Amino acid sequence: MPAPILDIFVDGACKGNPGIGGWGVLMRYGQHEKVLMGAQWHTTNNRMELTAAIEALKAIKRPCPILISTDSVYVKNGITHWLPVWKKNNWRNASKKPIKNIELWQALDQLNQRYEIEWRWVKGHAGNPGNEIADELANRAIESLRQKTS
């Protein structure tokens, strides 16, 4: 009997871009659910999207098949298409400029190599329950950080 799939939904949010940002993760494995979230000052939406994926992968306890759903075309295309080219070009884009968020992409690349992962893009704010929960967590993290400093 094959192992169940670890179903992960990741999302990032930013109030201002750059501005205060948050990330949220919903992880489902069989009947078990885990949520993660965090926030940062002076960040971007893309950084929060990447951070959500990184934190999700860091939280995995043991190898299993993984499906990661993101509403970020940047993350989905980056990890599935652009990353091999960036690495071959010494972490530079087609214009020969260093890629943005290099430290996050390198961290995600290392974690991505540890597991068997299928990356899936989902339309944001379109009623996908897992994506809606991850989005809610990201926004809740932003509000929590705001309240801590008010």
Curated annotation (Swiss-Prot):
InterPro entries: RNase_H (IPR050092), RNaseH-like_sf (IPR012337), RNaseH_domain (IPR002156), RNaseH_sf (IPR036397), RNaseHI (IPR022892). Mg(2+) 1 binds at residues 11, 49, 71. GO terms for cellular component: cytoplasm. Its cofactor is Mg(2+). The keyword Ribonucleoprotein does not apply. Its main location: cytoplasm. One of its GO terms (molecular function) is RNA-DNA hybrid ribonuclease activity. HAMAP family: RNase_H. Belongs to the RNase H family. Endonuclease that specifically degrades the RNA of RNA-DNA hybrids. This is Ribonuclease H. It comes from Dichelobacter nodosus (strain VCS1703A).
